[in-house]
Amino acid sequence: MMDYTESICFSAETAEELNRKAFSLDCRLFMFAYYEPKQYREAESKRSQFLTAIVNLYGLFKDCGSFLGELLKTRDTILVTPKWKAIQNDYNMLFQAVTSLRSIFCHNNSLCYPLNEDVLQRAENSISEYLPNAPDIEDITETQWTILLQKLCTAADDFFQELSSNMNLLVSCKDVSRKNRIITRWITASSSC
């Protein structure tokens, strides 16, 4: 049985590490404010653990680091790695999955309204990214929830590892002018959310 307690989905350590790197650039910077993920009990179903991971990631993206999407929009913000486009794509895919899945699990979405059908379709598409040929959400088995949880944790951890590697490059960047532009944009983005 896989232990997910070290994943960003259930642990604040990666977020705190990114905050330390941001702070080392400039004492006014942070990446995520006050991330406190909810824990799961081993006795819970994998579906419940998956939902907890979704709620935690949503909180991380929307409550703690709502400006991250803005910072990742263009290469000339915080992204200094040659893999900047992949980081943007991974963020967009993960954010889309988290927001659509949270929407169907945490809101009263009657399927008799077209808007809710769109949300359900996006959620099912997100699940299909992690579990090809997945059944309807209500028919997913415990084994499939286990696979979904593992793949979600892996995708989130991989994304944040790439972001951390990028932060290492940014911290060691010798182009002071570029670094100062990035810091200014970062402060502006974080203060506007």
Give the location of each predicted region:
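Short, surface-exposed, charge-dense and proline/glycine-enriched linear segments
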Residues: 102-103, 142-154
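Histidine-centered, metal-coordinating catalytic motifs and their short helical/loop contexts
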Residues: 90-132
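Extended charged low-complexity segments that act as oligomerization/scaffolding linkers
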Residues: 114-115, 133, 140-147
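Short, highly charged low-complexity linear segments
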Residues: 116-135, 162-176
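Alpha-helix initiation/capping motif
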Residues: 65, 108, 138-141
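Acidic, Ser/Thr-rich low-complexity intrinsically disordered segments
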Residues: 191-193
